[in-house]
């Protein structure tokens, strides 16, 4: 019979604690651990102690995430979690748990019930279609309205 609740014989390194936040600080490029992809309704969250992904919330509506979502290693926001990052303009699915390089184009300030919960806005660093985007304002008024509306309905 299997022995349950035994300590692991090997330990997987927690990428949240060993990866650098910036890969190229002069160009605002950061490592990002992908938690969920755009067009999904389920919410996954990185467990900070282990670095594993956990299903945090099962989606119950047809309102899907309009962006890929993750966190930046070796950072902490005022809410005690790693800095959240939205990656916009992603056309192919990103694999949850994978690491991508993202170029920061801004920060949106949010208050989640009296708690600071800012969102870093970024594009994939190597996506040539996004080279002309230098600020999230370059994404247009509709993007800003869609994102603000979405985040007002879904607390992430």
What do the predicted segments below correspond to?
Residues 28-31, 66-68, 82-84, 117-120:
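Short, surface-exposed beta-edge/turn micro-motifs
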Residues 2-53:
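N- or domain-start disorder-to-order transition segments that initiate the globular core
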Residues 68-69, 79, 84-90, 94-95:
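Compact, glycine-rich, soluble single-domain proteins
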Residues 53-81:
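Short, well-structured hydrophobic secondary-structure segments
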Residues 36, 74, 90:
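Residues immediately flanking
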Residues 154-156:
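Conserved small/polar residues in nucleotide/adenosyl-binding loops
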Residues 95, 99-126:
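A structural-propensity feature for long, helix-poor, extended segments
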Residues 114-150:
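Well-ordered alpha/beta subsegment
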């Amino acid at each position: 019979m299997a022995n349950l609740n035994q300590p692991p014989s090997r330990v997987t390194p927690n990428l949240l604690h060993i990866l650098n936040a910036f890969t190229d600080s002069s160009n605002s490029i950061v490592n990002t651990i992908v938690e969920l992809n755009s067009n999904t309704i389920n919410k996954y969250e990185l467990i900070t102690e282990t670095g594993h992904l956990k299903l945090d919330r099962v989606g119950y509506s047809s309102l899907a995430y309009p962006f890929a979502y993750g966190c930046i290693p070796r950072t902490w926001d005022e809410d005690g979690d790693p800095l959240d990052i939205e990656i916009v303009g992603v056309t192919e699915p990103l694999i949850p748990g994978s690491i991508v390089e993202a170029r920061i184009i801004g920060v949106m300030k949010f208050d989640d019930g009296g708690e600071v919960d800012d969102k870093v806005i970024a594009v994939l660093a190597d996506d040539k279609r996004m080279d002309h985007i230098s600020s999230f304002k370059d994404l247009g008024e509709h993007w800003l309205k869609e994102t603000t509306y979405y985040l007002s309905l879904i607390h992430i």
